[in-house]
Amino acid sequence: MAKQSMKARDVKRVKLAEKFYAKRMELKKIISDANSSDEDRWDAVLKLQSLPRDASPSRQRNRCRQTGRPHGVLRKFGLSRIKVREAAMRGEIPGLKKASW
């Protein structure tokens, strides 16, 4: 199990990313626009740097919904490989069966 503080930190990062999403996209659009002036681009870069670090989506970590484990998380299920295997063996994931060839 992951520490509660680590789980809470990731939840905080998700909320911050949602809050600043529109503003980040607006600034990034100005920065990548070839028609905008150099001054506008520079101002946009400075404003983007002034946003909170945790507002960046790349700072988020995929974690297992049950345990909070940060590694080996399968996106399709939102669970770690260990919990997916346990759930699959109990038949709790519809359509998923053990491979056999």
UniProtKB/Swiss-Prot annotation:
SUPFAM superfamilies: Glucocorticoid receptor-like (DNA-binding domain) (SSF57716). GO terms for cellular component: cytoplasm; small ribosomal subunit. One of its GO terms (biological process) is translation. Gene3D superfamilies: 1.10.287.1480. Keywords: Ribonucleoprotein, Ribosomal protein, RNA-binding, rRNA-binding. It comes from the Bacteria. One of its GO terms (molecular function) is structural constituent of ribosome. Binds 16S rRNA, required for the assembly of 30S particles and may also be responsible for determining the conformation of the 16S rRNA at the A site. Belongs to the universal ribosomal protein uS14 family. This is Small ribosomal subunit protein uS14. It comes from Actinobacillus succinogenes (strain ATCC 55618 / DSM 22257 / CCUG 43843 / 130Z).
